């Protein structure tokens, strides 16, 4: 036999190599041209961005994510990094465009660029997984079972890392947060945010594997795999959350111009919230909830502000949860106070997750010289709080999340572990105008309500303010950029969902599946190559 014929025979044989997991698909390892892959990644990143609020076309997550994953098939390391950066920029550049409203393009480009680098690193791992898995698990069971799980685990691993690092991470943009209005959202009570992201990525990887099948008849049959997984996900009932009474809440949106660069006179923001509350005087409620920064005068240091809060609490015959900035020696805190007429501040919470490069500048000595004009916009550094994120409101335990706190998985778990019956989430969204930022944050709050099995009172200076039930439904909602109040009987619960019981081990497990699967695939692929 000639060398040419022998080589062709060996190639043909390698395409049909049998595996303990089934017969290999011929031509399954074909890859796209680089420019096509880049275009798919950009289209995928843009599609994923549209799945999130404001548009909220959540089914697009099953279009955008598969396109990104498909663009990585067969890519070399540097190609996967380049494709990943393009896909990341398409997603992040669209998803967080709201940063530009008051801060301009530089912070937007910096954050989108940083997140795109992390996105690209995750894509590089996924590209390696495609390459090794095609060799290690060439049979049908490997292609449709093992490989998609590995790919989904690596996607979730990247989300886990960027949600926690650096400087506490940036948890925005996780796949699960796109599903706040979808039937898949209920799953977070069982598997948590990371678990739902894993499931969505798993379905997406299955879609890619079916699309890669070279024989049309096989594609039709094997399409039952992602369809079956989706059907299984939708068949899981909502977690049985049992309510245990209600609390009557008055949540106030003052429509205050409380932005970073707003030209307001001292006390104006406080008066805006007093004016919005005055029509409720005499109404029977258990607690009044004002937003983050609702008192621009620190009532712990300012007698005028303290007197106003005493008067409002007296008129409402109820305690007030009010956001303000407090100081203690050289430390400055973004705080919530529980204020009662006659007693003053009976409890205090200091924000546990202040926003890096917004509420404080980490490693100021390093970063400030790099862009002094930009970082001069952060004249003071908020200190990370040390108090627990709970208030006891006449026997009702309220978990507390100031603005960005709501994206932190650990802080939500701390509330529930501390016995929270309800979650109060005061926030100040004035810096983001009429953009999608506030509805994206509300979507996260909605997912937290379902995940924790708790009602969430999301109260903003300008909106979007809403009260969310433990099942994620909307109890009440206010128009943005208008003063208003929500007075509702809000359900309480002591049910502990599976997501809260399992906690971090869920995300560590699914992330570990990706990492361990990648290592195993690499070892098996190398062994097959040497054999």
Locate each region found by the language model.
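Conserved beta-strand and immediately adjacent loop positions that scaffold enzyme active sites
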Residues: 248, 335, 387, 455, ...
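Flexible, glycine- and charge-enriched loops at secondary-structure boundaries
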Residues: 115, 263-270, 435-438
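Soluble catalytic regions of membrane-associated enzymes that act on cell-envelope
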Residues: 236-357, 361, 390-394, 400, ...
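Membrane-embedded alpha-helical bundles of multi-pass enzymes
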Residues: 3-8, 13-237, 433-434, 445-448, ...
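Active-site catalytic loop in hydrolytic enzyme cores
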Residues: 99-106, 133, 162-191, 311-314, ...
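General beta-strand structural signal in soluble alpha/beta enzymes
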Residues: 162, 167, 322, 348-349, ...
């Amino acid at each position: 036999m000639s060398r040419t014929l022998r080589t062709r025979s060996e190639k043909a044989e390698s395409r049909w190599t049998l595996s303990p997991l089934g017969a290999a698909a011929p031509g399954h390892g074909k890859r796209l041209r680089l420019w096509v892959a880049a275009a798919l990644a950009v289209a995928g990143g843009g599609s994923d961005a549209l799945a999130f609020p404001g548009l909220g076309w959540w089914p697009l997550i099953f279009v955008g994510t598969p396109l990104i994953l498909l663009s990585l098939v067969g890519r070399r390391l540097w190609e996967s990094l380049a494709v990943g950066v393009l896909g990341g920029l398409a997603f992040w550049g669209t998803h967080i465009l709201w940063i530009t409203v008051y801060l301009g393009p530089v912070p937007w480009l910096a954050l989108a660029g940083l997140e795109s680098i992390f996105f690209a690193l995750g894509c590089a791992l996924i590209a390696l997984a495609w390459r090794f898995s095609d060799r290690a698990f060439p049979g049908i069971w490997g292609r449709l079972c093992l490989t998609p799980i590995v790919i989904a685990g690596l996607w979730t691993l990247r989300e886990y890392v960027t949600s926690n690092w650096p400087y506490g991470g940036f948890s925005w943009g996780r796949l699960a947060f796109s599903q706040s209005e979808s039937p898949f959202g209920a799953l977070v009570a069982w598997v948590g945010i990371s678990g739902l992201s894993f499931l969505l990525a798993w379905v997406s990887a299955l879609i890619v594997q079916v699309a890669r099948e070279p024989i049309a008849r096989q594609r039709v049959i094997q399409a039952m795999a992602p369809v079956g997984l989706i059907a299984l996900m939708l068949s899981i009932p909502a977690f049985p959350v049992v309510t245990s009474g209600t609390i009557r809440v008055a949540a106030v949106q003052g429509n205050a111009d409380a932005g970073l660069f707003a030209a307001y006179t001292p006390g104006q923001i406080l008066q805006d919230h007093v004016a919005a509350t005055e029509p409720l005087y005499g109404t029977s409620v258990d607690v009044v909830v004002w937003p983050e920064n609702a008192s621009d005068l620190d009532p712990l240091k300012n007698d005028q502000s303290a007197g106003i809060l005493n008067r409002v609490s007296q008129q409402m015959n109820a305690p007030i949860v009010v956001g303000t900035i407090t100081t203690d020696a050289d430390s400055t805190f973004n705080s919530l106070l529980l204020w009662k007429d006659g007693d003053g501040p009976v409890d205090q919470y200091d924000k546990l997750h202040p926003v890096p490069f917004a509420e404080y500048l980490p490693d100021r000595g390093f970063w400030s010289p790099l862009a002094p004009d930009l970082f001069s916009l952060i004249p003071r550094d908020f200190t990370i709080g040390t108090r627990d994120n709970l208030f006891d409101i006449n026997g009702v335990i309220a978990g507390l999340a100031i603005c960005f706190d709501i994206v932190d998985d650990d802080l939500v778990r701390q509330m529930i572990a501390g016995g929270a019956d309800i979650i109060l989430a005061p926030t100040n969204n004035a810096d983001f105008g009429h953009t999608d930022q506030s509805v994206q944050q509300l979507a996260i709050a909605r997912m937290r309500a379902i995940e924790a099995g708790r009602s969430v009172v999301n109260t903003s200076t300008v909106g979007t303010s809403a009260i969310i039930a433990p099942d994620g439904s909307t109890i009440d909602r206010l128009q943005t950029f208008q003063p208003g109040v929500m007075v509702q009987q809000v359900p309480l619960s002591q049910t502990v969902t599976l997501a809260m019981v399992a906690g971090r081990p869920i995300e560590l497990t699914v992330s570990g599946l990706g990492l361990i699967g990648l290592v195993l695939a690499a070892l098996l692929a190398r062994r097959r190559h040497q054999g």
